């Protein structure tokens, strides 16, 4: 072995042949194996995005096909969100106890199977039930894919990589809108559910056969050193030769705690950040789900065609894809809380401008895109921020509970849209009202930068 390589190896291994696995990940160049993990996790959140947004794109055609009033669609819009709350709240502690991979596999089976069932619904009652059950799988998949991938990213570019991975969620929502603009008129609303059902079931096979368990989870739980070595040898094989033991930094401080995952979330070290993350995510999802659920319908009310309404809804989601590279890069270099706060504030401003732009179709599309860039960029960065904030022992729970509690904001956003429409609020009035949750999210995450900025890893 060359002298330089031998000296580098000594930086990782102690006299007991114990290797700091996180230091290995941080210092090694990205391997093909890590890119494979990135692709699989990207596809998971991509199909999650398609299925999450499906109801918003289907709603106008469904209302016309079944002859129901738009105000009757509120329960259908909110049903999946209710399931997502349960899925997120249950899956986090489950993943921290049994592993990320098994939770991901089961979540894809659940939301794929019940999305297919939605395609065969014959009334609103059955559709509400199937969308609720779909939501349980959706709520479990996204935070656990984010957690798993973040644990394979080097600290120097973690925010950039995870934000780019997570933009698959926004891309899935956008592609769902673009596809539905021709798929639904050609083949009916059932076709989008069929697409959104088969895709995760096929992807589940990739998860089972190609996605590894989190090496950090295996180390902290004291499980299968041989398996950890096999995983890390596919990332930096020269660094694991002769190593008999692996560790990660925070286990020296946190391992053996009697608090449990919930005790850690609400310990003095994490409680302020936990509450502020929840408030921020809640307010962000009020904005996103009001627009995701009702923007196509609102556009139809202003005279837009079905195809145009679906296109503009997809354009809003596509904005999150465009912002991923910049916001991830900025979070790795500056205070990530303040970067996100700026994006939320910009989202509220652009929402107000969108409400004033109905008379100019070109400007309307441009400002819808800008609003999507701002709010989806901020929201897609929140799981990254949460994963950075919590240690391995409670990371899946921390990310998932932020997602789960935040989903109450999604339910509220979808519900309040139906209420405001039922009370004859105009397009302009509804869009202008969104400055309130935008400002609240910006303030909450800015305060976090002052009182709870520390990263766990």
UniProtKB/Swiss-Prot annotation:
GO terms for cellular component: plasma membrane. This is 4-hydroxybenzoate transporter PcaK. One of its GO terms (molecular function) is carboxylic acid transmembrane transporter activity. Residues 1-34, 94-101, 150-168, 213-274, 332-338, 385-400, 448-457 are cytoplasmic. Homotrimer. NCBIfam families: 2A0115. Its main location: membrane. Keywords: Cell inner membrane, Cell membrane, Membrane, Transmembrane, Transmembrane helix, Transport. The chain crosses the membrane at residues 35-55, 73-93, 102-122, 129-149, 169-189, 192-212, 275-295, 311-331, 339-359, 364-384, 401-421, 427-447. The keyword Lyase does not apply. Residues 56-72, 123-128, 190-191, 296-310, 360-363, 422-426 are periplasmic. It is a multi-pass membrane protein. It is found in: Cell inner membrane. The keyword Glycosyltransferase does not apply. Uptake of 4-hydroxybenzoate (4-HB). Can also transport a variety of aromatic acids with hydroxyl substitutions at the 2-, 3- and 4-positions, such as salicylate, 2,4-dihydroxybenzoate, protocatechuate, 3-hydroxybenzoate, vanillate and gentisate. It comes from Acinetobacter baylyi (strain ATCC 33305 / BD413 / ADP1). Belongs to the major facilitator superfamily. Aromatic acid:H(+) symporter (AAHS) (TC 2.A.1.15) family.
